[in-house]
Each structure stands twice: as structure tokens, then as C-alpha cells.
Regions:
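Structural motif
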Residues: 251-259, 294-296, 300, 329-335, ...
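Active-site cores that bind ATP or allylic diphosphates and position pyrophosphate for catalysis
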Residues: 94, 98-227, 233-239, 247
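Small-residue-rich helix-loop
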Residues: 316-401
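Hydrophobic, well-ordered secondary-structure elements that form the walls
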Residues: 412
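Short, conserved secondary-structure transition motifs
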Residues: 74-78, 230-235
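A conserved active-site cap/scaffold subdomain adjacent to cofactor or substrate pockets
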Residues: 243, 247-324
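N-terminal Rossmann-like or analogous alpha/beta NTP/dinucleotide-binding catalytic cores
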Residues: 1-112, 206-220
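Single conserved hydrophobic/aromatic residue that forms the stacking wall/gate
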Residues: 424-435
């Protein structure tokens, strides 16, 4: 088994294509397969090394590794060989219509109530007519001639999928300037690298119909396909890939654990519950690609945040101490971690709790009567705390001191947090479990 992830280095990796990468990688892990990284950089004007490096860094941070990587921009000689084969087989044919002419044809077909399918008029050109056009300086674009037959496959996620090729336009594979569109280099690379399984978004389903015929034309075996549904927001709308806040880099910078993202993106929209897991082997064991739903999954940043919060609680001090060191925490103690881990959503919030504890330790700065502090400590219930603990505790303090309202809650807040404002207004995820 061999899978690949093939991003275009035209932007940062976001939740949509990150999910494709994660699904391919975990599928290989589950089945002892090989995972490779292909960089689709045939669009020289939009591709950049900066984005390529960013994509690789984000994939590595997620925990994904690959046996090797390659760039499509370095494989033109391989593509040229296959192009000649397709031309010799008469499966690639030159077309000379301008964009304006094609737009008029499309408009005419639609106004007549017909599907906008290319009419193959260029196939009527003789060799002499083609040669004259080229000699006059008109460069053709090249279309792949589809066999008009049923194109079907058993999709690992979607089930039975089929297209009648008569209802599809012959796809353009080569632009007039000689550059290649997505289809041809993708299929050729899958053949050359012996890819056995292709897992990608459902926006590629129509492309797969084209690709199957290109595989056949090049006399290659056809890989297995799996098309996963899109992620949508909580209102059911799709995400823009340009939405920077949903880039993997942004999640990393905010402080999410990579294991939380792996867990969430693998099991969102599946029949499996999304439970906090800290062990990658457990995730691999749990994953079943056929459990993924055929319909779109709703992405919730709140659900992801809660998952990250609950995942952090699973980590022991030994498992997390290096991260405390990385954020330059001054409190490198197991007792500190036990104290804060139930009150944070991200490990980097340990710095906020350092400030809180430092203030609390310096009780004189709080301007609170010592007798009140002693009463609060004496009446503090034993673990475990639950939703009733706060009311029981404050009721006992009220009976002992006679304080109520702000006179009771303000000093308690200062004792617990070192802050005069509620942590609800400061940073929701840092709010202590007790309050």
C-alpha cells in the first residue's frame, strides 16, 4: 500500500487539506503502508518555496512523516514522454478556440437548455489545417479525448460512484503556453510512484472520472479512491482556504496540541466518538476510514478547544515538563502541573497561572484580612470538586464571617486568582474549575 499527499505551495496549509494529509498518513499507519509527499508546483507564478517550507513544517508539527518527497516542477521530462504516447494514441488533440469563443459556445448551449459540454469541433480539423494555424502563430491547447462509456468505481467512503462520459467535456490537459493543468502530472506521478490508494476531498470526484480514463490510456492499473466530505462551519457554510485563522500554523501558535488536531480531524463526521486521547497508537487502532460519514462534517472551534483542554488533563508532569520548559515557565514542579492542568485549555497558559500564584503567595499585596484567608482555607471542602462545591464553600464562609455579595466574592476571587476581575472577562479557558 502506498499513499500520497499532494499540496500546492500557493498558501499555508489549512484545516481542509490538512485533514486530507492526516487521513492519508493515518491510513498508511493503520495498514503498514508507505506515505509520500508530492509538491504540486507546476504553477510557477503562484508557487513559492516559502509556502513549501511552511507546509512541510506544519506537517512535521502535526507528527506526519514521509518516506520521501518530490516536486512536480522537476519532472517535466517524464510528463513529456507520456504526452507523446497520448498524442500517438490520438487521445490528446489540439484545440484553437479562444476563451471568448468557448464562453459563447457555453452560453449558447445553456440558453438552449443543453449541458455545456465541449462539442469536439477541433477534431474535424485536418492535419494541414492544424499545421497552418500553428504556423500562423496560434498555439493550441490540448484536450484529452474521453471514451464515451460509463466510468465507475467503488469509492472507499462514498460507495458506488459513476459518470456517463458522454455528459463530460473532454478536459484540457495542456494550456496554450505549454504549461500543464492538474490532471496529467497528477496521474503520471501516481503511475510512476506506484500509488495504490488516493484519498482526497470530494471536490475531486469529477476529476477522478477523468483520471481513471487517463490511467487506462496509459495502460496502468487504477488505484483505489476515497473521497472525504468537506468540513463546514456550524451554520453549514463552507470555509475559505484563505481564512488565515484556520491555518495549521495559527492553531500551533495558539497552543493546540498536535494530537488534539489529529484526533479531531480523523473522527469528526464519523461514527466514532471524539474522546480525548494522548497516545497516537490508540488513535491508529481506533481509526476506520469506512466509519467516515458521506455528508459534510461541522467544524466547531469550541469543540476542538474543549478536546484540547481535556487532552491536556491526560498528560503527566513527565510527559509535559519539556513543554513547560519551552514556554520558559519558572515553575518546573509536578505540584504546579497538577494544580493548573484542570484549569487551562493550552499549556502556554501556565504563564498566566505563574502570575496568579506569585500574587497569591505574596498575600500582603492582596490587602485581605488574615482571618478571612484562614476561614476560607479551613472551610475548603476536600477533593473532588463538582458544581455544588462553590455554593457549599461560600455558604460556610458566609456563616462564619457574615460576609455576603461583593464583600464575600471579591476577596475570594483575589485569593483564588490574584485578579480583581473575573477570569471570565480575562481569559475564559483559564477560569479555575472551582469557580
Amino acid at each position: 500500500m502506498k499513499c500520497r499527499f499532494a499540496p500546492s505551495p500557493t498558501g499555508k496549509i489549512h484545516i481542509g487539506n490538512a485533514r486530507s494529509a492526516i487521513l492519508n498518513w493515518i491510513f498508511c499507519q493503520k495498514n503498514q503502508g508507505e506515505f509520500v509527499l508530492r509538491i504540486d508546483d507546476t504553477d510557477a507564478n503562484r508557487s513559492s518555496k516559502e509556502f513549501e517550507t511552511s507546509i512541510k513544517d506544519d506537517l512535521k508539527w502535526l507528527g506526519l512523516n514521509w518516506s520521501y518527497t518530490f516536486n512536480q516542477s522537476s519532472r517535466q521530462h517524464i510528463y513529456n514522454e507520456k504526452i507523446q504516447i497520448l498524442k500517438q494514441k490520438k487521445r490528446l488533440y489540439p484545440c484553437f478556440e479562444t476563451e471568448e469563443e468557448l464562453a459563447l459556445k457555453k452560453k449558447s448551449l445553456l440558453s438552449s437548455g443543453k449541458p455545456p459540454i465541449y462539442d469536439r469541433s477541433s477534431l474535424n480539423l485536418s492535419d494541414e489545417e492544424v499545421e497552418k494555424k500553428i504556423e500562423s502563430g496560434i498555439q493550441p491547447h490540448w484536450r484529452f479525448k474521453l471514451d464515451h462509456e460509463n466510468i465507475g468505481w467503488k469509492d472507499i467512503i462514498k460507495g458506488d460512484v459513476s459518470f456517463d462520459a458522454k455528459n463530460l467535456s473532454d478536459p484540457v490537459l495542456i494550456r496554450a503556453d505549454g504549461t500543464l493543468l492538474y490532471h496529467l502530472p497528477s496521474v503520471i506521478d501516481d503511475i510512476e510512484e506506484k500509488i495504490t490508494h488516493i484519498i482526497r476531498g470530494e471536490d475531486h470526484i469529477a476529476n477522478t472520472a477523468y483520471h481513471i480514463q487517463i490511467f487506462k490510456a496509459l495502460e496502468s492499473s487504477i488505484p483505489s479512491f476515497a473521497h472525504h466530505p468537506f468540513l463546514v462551519d456550524e451554520t453549514g457554510k463552507g470555509f475559505s482556504k484563505r481564512l488565515g485563522s484556520l491555518s495549521i500554523e495559527n492553531f500551533r501558535d495558539e497552543g493546540y496540541e498536535n494530537i488534539s488536531l489529529l484526533n479531531y480531524f480523523l473522527f469528526i463526521g464519523s461514527s466514532s466518538n471524539i474522546d480525548p486521547i494522548k497516545d497516537l497508537n490508540e488513535i491508529v487502532k481506533k481509526f476506520d476510514i469506512q466509519s467516515l460519514s458521506r455528508s459534510s462534517a461541522k467544524f466547531s472551534i469550541e469543540s476542538l478547544r474543549n478536546l484540547n483542554e481535556n487532552t491536556i488533563k491526560l498528560f503527566s508532569y513527565n510527559e509535559i515538563s519539556h513543554k513547560l520548559k519551552n514556554i520558559k515557565s519558572n515553575f518546573q514542579k509536578e505540584s504546579f502541573w497538577r494544580f493548573i492542568k484542570n484549569n487551562i485549555s493550552f499549556v502556554n497558559q501556565a504563564k498566566e497561572w505563574e502570575e496568579v500564584i506569585t500574587k497569591i503567595n505574596n498575600a500582603k499585596d492582596l490587602n485581605i484580612d488574615d482571618s478571612f484567608i484562614n476561614t476560607a482555607v479551613d472551610e475548603l471542602p476536600e477533593d473532588p470538586f463538582d458544581e455544588t462545591t462553590w455554593d457549599h464553600w461560600t455558604s460556610k464562609i458566609n456563616k462564619k464571617t457574615g460576609l455576603k455579595g461583593k464583600d464575600l466574592f471579591m476577596p475570594l476571587r483575589l485569593i483564588l486568582t490574584g485578579k480583581s476581575l473575573s477570569l471570565i472577562h480575562i481569559s475564559e479557558p483559564t477560569r479555575p474549575a472551582l469557580i
